């Protein structure tokens, strides 16, 4: 460590001391002085600068040492002149080496010492004359008993002295006001004592048993009280009692000579033990604050647990214990936080109950039993089994499997027998609770099953009988189509006949034995019935070479039918027919031949019997019947001859009106001619063959005779488009006439004419055309011969004759041409004065010019057509000639709005001239001019417009031809030339358009340096953009109009271009709160760039950027906000246009995503909302099996409910925010939906003692079910079932009771909702049995716990243990000793109320025995069953009654019988005694001396409640007549039942113990 380090602490301490001490005022104000002007405060401060290299840590002075020194003034001091402050500034130089530092410190100390000496001198000077007048003398003496203080101008007296000059002695405490001071000593007033009279004297001077200290007696150890006159009790009774003459009288709950002990608890005992709990009780005590119960496994005291039990409670169920473990249970009473001495109890929990047991496999001779190993360790299992109805029981030892389950295969069993099986876990000498189940071996099945004597519908079945005792056999036979029938066969038969079978079917036959609802394995065989034969074989639809055969189908399932047919000459054929057909057609037969037909069914190689019949074929009919050589009254008929041997042919023909004739034709002919027919008649012709009375089918055809044609055809009444045709009518009966007319070019039309007319008019003809006309008669499709002629139409006249192109001497006429084919046209025109001219025009012309006409004359014009000598009608019109018009029209003296027009005058006599001028856009004006003028000036014209000018003469309504010319006005110049829309490289120039119609505008722009450019733009434009300009340059702009070579005056203005703006502005590197922007720099010389960014809600920031930079980072942005970013350049006050872009920050993602309120198909999720302004949230949830759904959620929500989920499924949930197409990062979580409950929980098959529950599984994947059902006494039983199970049988239930049942599904720790139902057993004979005999009569055959009802009153239930086995059963057991684990040395209250576990050792209770045996008409008998390890005995008394509590539960017993000897008669009539209630006649308390509670007399002959295992005389469990007083009987059971009850008088099925369940 360097020297700086060594000196750091002394120097720091020194500096702090200087700052704190030296700054104090030098002279405080004297209390004896009041003139403030004399007060002077002297202070000095040090400011020491220490080099930074020094390791000196100096804490800041809490009082500021500012240069003004104000901190040195006390509050309220305002006289600055009286305050003298010295400030000392000391600076230490940085030392070159450690010795330099030491020298510096020494110098510092020396300097400070000198300053302090100077300060002391100054203080001495300041102190002079500071004290008030006369006070200075005190400083010379203070009477020799004090010290003068110049600071205060007063004496500070020594101890024992007082006064201004310390000349007066003082007494201690000024005698405290209880005496007077004499020469420094107190003389006390009575009753005070002491050197300072501070305390009163002690009472009675502490009675000689103590010392008085400051007025209070300090008593000797064995005395107390204010005056120590009372003798002290031990420990002053510990505050838990009062002391009287040295003896403590304790409060209730305390004991001991000093009342320091709390009364210990009494009667700690075990009421009930289970696998993991011990129910303990003790005698209640109202004088405690609470009980302290502790317990630990034997030998593991360090594992002690302690519970605090309220004083109102005197039982406690210790839970969470280990099965099969011994525990030390300790109970203490606690009062005023003092614990009593403990009472201990050694108790053992039951071995863990074996889990569910079941029969895995049942065979005829074995049962495979399996059960779940308990959670605790066991050594092995005892498995007992025997027939349910017999006494034989076999026991085997089964080692515990290392697997979760153990099993044992019981073999060598009797078929069809129900066995009772018990599994008991063993650990050391401790047996666990047994689990009971039943198993039934299968019935052996029939063997050697055979079928014989099979017919079409019957079969006989036989078999070897089974060994088992059965009720019947069942025979089931199943057809191939699945139809099933069953029949029962008596158990003493081994064969039966199956009837009602279907023919040809292979039946599967099963035979098994049944007893009750149990069936054996099925033996099977097959029975094949014979095939039945077809019936009702018939033939029909016979033709000459085919016939149809049909039959009723067989019942048997066959492969096919076979049809055989044989002709008279012996030819035979066979045809297979499908099995689903019931008919077929035989083809290829010979006509007129008789056949024999056979039909039978086949299946494989089996055939049915054959059915047969006979059938002859028909004669074949003539074919190809045709008619030819038809005339109006004859026709020829021919046909192909038949194959059959016949006698003749027959021909019949029938007219349409029914007239029939018949003609025979020899068999060797095949044609004939029919004569005498009527014209135009259709005949139906039939031809057939005959042989004897047999006829073939008729061949037929139709043959119409020809129709006669019309005659004398003529035409008349011809026009241009019509002509009339007529003829003589035909004789035949026809449908109509047909008229056809054909032009020379082949155009043809046909017209039907009614049969009752003989003329018609043809219309729509073309003029001047010669038509060929044909007329004929029709009937159906038959036509007569045609009559014909020719007829031409008239020529048509010209139409639409008009006059046009009229001049002063000519006129053009035109017309529509005629349709007719003509030679020429003729034109004639005649003036009003009768002058006529006529000329010919070619047929192809439709107009001509009339010449040589006189001006102003109206002519009539006629035009007509000619063909040869044939002429059309004439067409006429009128044609007037025109007057002449002006000539040499010229314009001059043109301005922008006027021009002058002149012309040569017309020769004609007119009324006026008309001048019209029209602009190009159609605006027209007309001006009349006097007939004697030939010029005029047009005014109000538009500039630059070329006008069309027309001039003509008028006379009346007639106008001459117009003379015309064109005259343009001058062009006007552009106006209001202006520059707008300026950019860095363009100027937009606009102007008001000229009025003139121009060709173009010319634009010229010239820069300040003289560079000039010129360009043309369209006349329709009124603005243009000058491009390619240099930024910031001033330009002169000129604009003028042009039309052709003509130009307007020039308009001009000036303007300059803008600064260019940044380009390619882009955003990149965006985060939630920053964004980087960049741009291309401008070309212009600028001062800076400006960046402005504005959020969507209008928040704007603006920052400058140096001109040499082209990017910047925007900070302080908000997440998910789209910012509008603008960047522009600045130079002076001028700015470029702003470049814009968008910069959306990233959306922040949802946080703290959690799920809650999860149901089977919904889950509520919530999250912290994002800060960003978004459109929506998106939620995606994906099930474990991959199904995914997405839903949008409003941006205002931060939670949503997911619906449509699958029960019991884990979902992965993602939530993210969206704005437009943008998305935040996804937050995720998981949600596990609840399991849905089972469905349709229903009972069925309910009996007196049980029923079956069924349900449908939930949709969720589960591990299993928990089924819970409740007994009438409130006991709830819970059964865990595997997931594949959907039914459960409840057994051993009480009759006529409704059991609430609930079922939940579970998966791991998950539970579904509960579904509930009730199962009501069938009512019993005794709905509320009053004792075990009635319970037994309700068909409860197993011993165990049951609920009875006192006197049958449903409101007074009592749970008792019923012995259903001993001597016919029906016993209420009220006492049992068999293990010694339960202490029977109990108080009176315990014996009254009862104690213990009815399934183990217990005492039912005197109150219950009294209620059972008194106040009822039933007389009870009592039985004592006594057993040692190899002997047993019993004693029965035919009467038993226990009196009320008022009579101390006096015992009454009747007559004895049995093998144990009469011990109870001695106790008859005696009251019950316990160690705290002595009701016997002995000198001492028999219960106390014999360790029990009983109906003692002068003690006992029977002591069943004595100390278990005790062999001392009369202290053990004794039955003196049997084993004497020195043998403790290991097993005693006392029980009662109605006198004379016998089970043999009642019947009922046996039953297992309550609550046992059997799984399927």
Curated annotation (Swiss-Prot):
Keywords: Disulfide bond, EGF-like domain, Extracellular matrix, Glycoprotein, Repeat, Secreted, Signal. GO terms for molecular function: identical protein binding; integrin binding. Residues 1044-1061 have a biased composition (Basic and acidic residues). The keyword Chloroplast does not apply. Residues 264-353, 354-444, 445-532, 533-622, 623-706, 709-798, 799-882, 885-970, 973-1062, 1063-1144, 1149-1238, 1239-1325 form the Fibronectin type-III domain. Pfam families: EGF_Tenascin, EGF_Teneurin, Fibrinogen_C, fn3. Residues 167-198, 199-229, 230-260 form the EGF-like domain. SUPFAM superfamilies: Fibrinogen C-terminal domain-like (SSF56496), Fibronectin type III (SSF49265). Glycans are attached at residue 1411. Residues 868-888, 1044-1063 are annotated as: Disordered. Disulfide bonds join 171-181, 175-186, 188-197, 202-212, 206-217, 219-228, 233-243, 237-248, 250-259. It is found in: Secreted, Extracellular space, Extracellular matrix. Its main location: secreted. One of its GO terms (cellular component) is cell surface. Highest expression in kidney followed by spleen and brain. In brain, highest expression is found in hippocampus, cerebellum and olfactory bulb. Expressed in aortic valve, corneal limbus. Expressed in ribs periosteum. During a fracture repair process, expression increases in cells of newly formed perichondrium/peristeum surrounding the cartalaginous callus. The keyword Lipoprotein does not apply. Residues 1323-1540 form the Fibrinogen C-terminal domain. PROSITE patterns: EGF_1, EGF_2, FIBRINOGEN_C_1, FIBRINOGEN_C_2, FN3. NCBIfam families: GGGWT_bact. Belongs to the tenascin family. Extracellular matrix protein that seems to be a ligand for ITGA8:ITGB1, ITGAV:ITGB1 and ITGA4:ITGB1. Involved in neurite outgrowth and cell migration in hippocampal explants. During endochondral bone formation, inhibits proliferation and differentiation of proteoblasts mediated by canonical WNT signaling. In tumors, stimulates angiogenesis by elongation, migration and sprouting of endothelial cells. Expressed in most mammary tumors, may facilitate tumorigenesis by supporting the migratory behavior of breast cancer cells. Homohexamer. This is Tenascin-N. It comes from Mus musculus (Mouse).
């Amino acid at each position: 460590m360097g020297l700086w380090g060594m000196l750091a602490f002394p120097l720091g301490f020194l500096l702090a001391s200087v700052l704190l001490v030296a700054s104090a005022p030098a002279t405080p104000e004297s209390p004896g002085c009041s003139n403030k002007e004399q007060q002077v405060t002297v202070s000095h401060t040090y400011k020491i600068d220490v080099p930074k290299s020094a390791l000196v840590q100096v804490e800041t002075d809490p009082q500021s040492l500012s240069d003004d020194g104000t901190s040195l003034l006390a509050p309220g001091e305002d006289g600055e002149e009286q305050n003298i402050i010295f400030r000392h500034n000391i600076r230490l130089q940085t030392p070159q080496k450690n010795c330099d530092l030491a020298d510096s410190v020494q110098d510092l100390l020396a300097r400070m010492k000198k300053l302090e000496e100077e300060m002391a001198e100054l203080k001495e000077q300041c102190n002079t004359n500071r004290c008030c007048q006369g006070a200075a003398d005190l400083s010379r003496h203070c009477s020799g008993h004090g010290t003068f203080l110049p600071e205060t101008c007063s004496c500070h007296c020594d101890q024992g002295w007082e006064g201004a000059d310390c000349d007066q002695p003082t007494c201690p405490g000024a005698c405290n006001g209880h005496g007077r001071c004499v020469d420094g000593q107190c003389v006390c007033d009575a009753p005070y004592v002491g050197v300072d009279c501070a305390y009163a004297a002690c009472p009675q001077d502490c009675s000689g048993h103590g010392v008085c200290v400051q007025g209070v007696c300090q008593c000797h150890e064995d005395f107390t009280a204010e005056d120590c006159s009372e003798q002290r009790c031990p420990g002053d009774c510990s505050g838990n009692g009062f002391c009287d003459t040295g003896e403590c009288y304790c409060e209730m709950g305390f004991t001991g000579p000093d009342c320091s002990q709390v009364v210990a608890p009494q009667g700690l005992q075990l009421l009930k033990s289970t696998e993991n709990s011990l129910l303990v009780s003790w005698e209640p005590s109202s004088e405690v604050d609470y009980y302290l119960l502790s317990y630990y496994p034997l030998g593991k005291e360090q594992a002690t647990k302690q519970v605090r039990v309220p004083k109102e409670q005197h039982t406690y169920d210790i839970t969470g214990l280990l099965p099969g473990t011994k525990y030390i249970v300790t109970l203490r009473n606690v009062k005023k936080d003092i614990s009593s001495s403990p009472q201990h109890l050694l108790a053992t929990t039951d071995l863990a109950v074996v889990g569910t047991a079941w029969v895995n496999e049942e065979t005829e001779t074995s049962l495979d039993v399996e059960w779940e190993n308990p959670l605790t360790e066991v050594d092995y299992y005892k498995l007992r089994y025997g027939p349910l109805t017999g006494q034989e029981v076999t026991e085997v030892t089964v080692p515990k499997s290392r697997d979760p389950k153990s099993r044992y295969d019981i073999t060598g069993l009797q078929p069809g027998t129900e066995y009772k099986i018990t599994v008991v876990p063993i650990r050391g000498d401790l047996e666990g609770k047994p689990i009971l189940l039943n198993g039934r071996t299968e019935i052996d099945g029939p063997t050697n099953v055979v079928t014989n004597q099979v017919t079409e519908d019957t079969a006989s079945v036989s078999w070897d009988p089974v060994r088992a005792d059965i009720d019947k056999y069942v025979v089931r036979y199943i057809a191939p189509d699945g139809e099933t029938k069953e029949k029962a066969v008596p158990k003493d038969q081994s064969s039966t006949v199956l009837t009602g079978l279907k023919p040809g079917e292979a039946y599967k036959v099963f035979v098994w034995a049944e007893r009750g609802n149990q069936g054996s394995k099925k033996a099977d065989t097959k029975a094949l019935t014979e095939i039945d034969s077809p019936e009702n074989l018939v033939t029909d639809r016979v033709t000459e070479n085919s016939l149809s055969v049909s039959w009723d189908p067989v019942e048997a399932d066959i492969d096919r039918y076979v049809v055989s047919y044989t002709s008279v000459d012996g030819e035979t054929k066979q045809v297979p027919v499908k099995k689903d057909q019931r008919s077929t057609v035989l083809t290829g037969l010979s006509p007129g031949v008789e056949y024999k037909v056979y039909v039978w069914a086949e299946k494989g190689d089996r055939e049915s019997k054959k059915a047969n019949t006979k059938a002859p074929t028909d004669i074949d009919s003539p074919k190809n019947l045709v008619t030819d050589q038809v005339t109006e009254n004859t026709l020829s008929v021919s046909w192909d001859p038949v194959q059959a041997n016949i006698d003749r042919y027959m021909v019949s023909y029938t007219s349409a009106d029914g007239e029939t004739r018949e003609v025979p034709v020899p068999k060797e002919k095949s044609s004939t001619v029919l004569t005498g027919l009527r014209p135009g008649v259709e005949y139906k012709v039939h031809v057939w063959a005959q042989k004897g009375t047999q006829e073939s089918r008729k061949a037929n055809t139709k043959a119409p005779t020809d129709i006669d044609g019309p005659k004398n055809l003529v035409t008349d009444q011809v026009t241009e488009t019509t002509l009339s045709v007529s003829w003589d009518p035909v004789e035949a009966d026809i449908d109509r006439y047909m008229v056809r007319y054909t032009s020379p070019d082949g155009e043809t039309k046909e017209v039907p004419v009614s049969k009752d007319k003989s003329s018609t008019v043809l219309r729509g003809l073309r003029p001047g055309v010669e038509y060929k006309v044909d007329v004929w008669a029709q009937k159906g499709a038959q036509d007569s011969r045609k009559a014909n002629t020719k007829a031409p139409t008239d020529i048509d006249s010209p139409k639409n004759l008009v006059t046009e192109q009229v001049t002063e001497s000519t006129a053009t006429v035109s017309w529509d041409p005629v349709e007719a084919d003509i030679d020429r046209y003729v034109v004639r025109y005649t003036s009003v004065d009768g002058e006529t001219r006529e000329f010919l025009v070619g047929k192809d012309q439709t107009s001509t010019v009339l010449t040589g006409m006189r001006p102003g004359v109206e002519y009539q014009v006629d035009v007509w057509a000619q063909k040869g000598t044939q002429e059309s009608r004439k067409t006429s019109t009128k044609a007037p000639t025109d007057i002449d018009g002006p000539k040499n029209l010229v314009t001059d003296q043109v301005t922008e709005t006027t021009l002058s027009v002149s012309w040569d005058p017309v020769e004609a006599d007119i009324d006026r001239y008309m001048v019209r001028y029209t602009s190009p856009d159609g605006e027209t004006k007309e001006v009349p001019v006097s007939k004697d003028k030939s010029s005029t000036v047009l005014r109000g014209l538009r500039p630059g417009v070329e006008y069309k000018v027309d001039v003509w003469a008028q006379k009346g309504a007639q106008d001459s031809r117009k003379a015309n010319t064109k005259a343009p006005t001058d062009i006007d110049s552009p106006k209001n030339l202006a520059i707008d829309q300026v950019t860095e490289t363009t100027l937009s120039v606009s102007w008001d358009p000229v009025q003139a119609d121009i060709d173009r505008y010319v634009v010229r722009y010239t820069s300040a340096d003289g560079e000039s450019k010129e360009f043309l733009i369209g006349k329709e434009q009124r603005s243009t953009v000058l491009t390619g300009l240099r930024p910031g340059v001033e330009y002169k702009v000129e604009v003028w109009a042009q039309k052709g070579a003509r130009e307007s005056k020039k308009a001009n203005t000036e303007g300059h271009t803008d600064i260019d703006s940044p380009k390619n502005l882009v955003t990149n590197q965006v985060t939630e709160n920053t964004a980087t922007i960049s741009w291309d720099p401008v070309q212009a010389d600028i001062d800076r760039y400006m960046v402005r960014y504005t959020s969507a809600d209008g928040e704007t920031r603006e920052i400058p950027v140096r001109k040499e930079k082209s990017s910047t980072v925007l900070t302080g942005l908000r997440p998910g906000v789209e910012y509008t970013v603008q960047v522009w350049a600045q130079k002076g006050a001028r700015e470029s246009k702003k470049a814009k872009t968008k910069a959306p920050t990233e959306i922040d993602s949802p946080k703290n995503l959690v799920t809650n309120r999860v149901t089977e198909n919904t889950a509520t999720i919530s999250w912290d909302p994002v800060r960003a302004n978004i459109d929506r949230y998106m939620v995606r949830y994906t099930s474990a099996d991959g199904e995914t759904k997405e839903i949008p959620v409003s941006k205002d929500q931060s939670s949503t409910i997911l619906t449509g989920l699958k029960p019991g499924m884990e979902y992965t949930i993602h939530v993210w925010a969206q704005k437009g197409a943008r998305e935040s990062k996804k937050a995720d979580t998981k949600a596990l939906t609840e399991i849905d409950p089972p469905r349709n929980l229903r009972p069925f098959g309910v009996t007196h003692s049980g029923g079956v529950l069924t349900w449908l599984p939930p949709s969720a994947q589960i591990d299993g079910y928990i089924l819970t059902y409740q007994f009438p006494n409130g006991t709830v039983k819970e059964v865990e079932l595997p997931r594949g199970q959907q039914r459960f049988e409840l057994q051993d239930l009480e009759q006529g009771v409704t059991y609430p049942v609930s079922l939940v599904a579970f998966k791991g720790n998950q539970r579904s909702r509960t579904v509930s139902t009730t199962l009501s057993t069938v009512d019993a004979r005794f709905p509320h049995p009053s004792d075990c005999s009635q319970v037994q009569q309700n068909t409860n055959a197993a011993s165990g716990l049951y609920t009875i009802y006192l006197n049958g009153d449903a409101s007074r239930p009592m749970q008792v243990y019923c012995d259903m086995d001993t001597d016919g059963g029906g016993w209420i057991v009220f006492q049992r000793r068999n293990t010694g684990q339960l202490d029977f040395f109990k108080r009176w209250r315990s014996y009254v109320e009862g104690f213990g576990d009815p399934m183990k050792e217990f005492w039912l209770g005197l109150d219950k025995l009294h209620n059972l045996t008194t106040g009822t008409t039933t007389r009870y008998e009592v039985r004592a069953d006594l057993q040692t390890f190899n002997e047993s005995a019993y004693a029965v008394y035919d009467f038993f009654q226990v009196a009320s509590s008022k009579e101390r539960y006096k015992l009454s017993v009747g007559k004895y019988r049995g093998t144990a000897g009469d011990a109870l008669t001695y106790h008859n009539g005696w009251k019950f005694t316990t160690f705290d209630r002595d009701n016997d006649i002995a000198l001492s308390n028999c219960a106390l001396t014999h360790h029990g509670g009983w109906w003692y007399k002068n003690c006992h002959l029977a002591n069943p409640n004595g100390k278990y295992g005790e062999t001392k005389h009369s202290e053990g469990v004794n039955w003196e007549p049997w084993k004497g007083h020195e043998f403790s009987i290991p097993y005693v059971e006392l029980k009662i039942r109605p006198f004379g009850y016998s089970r043999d008088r009642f019947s009922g099925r046996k039953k297992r113990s309550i609550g046992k369940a059997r799984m399927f």
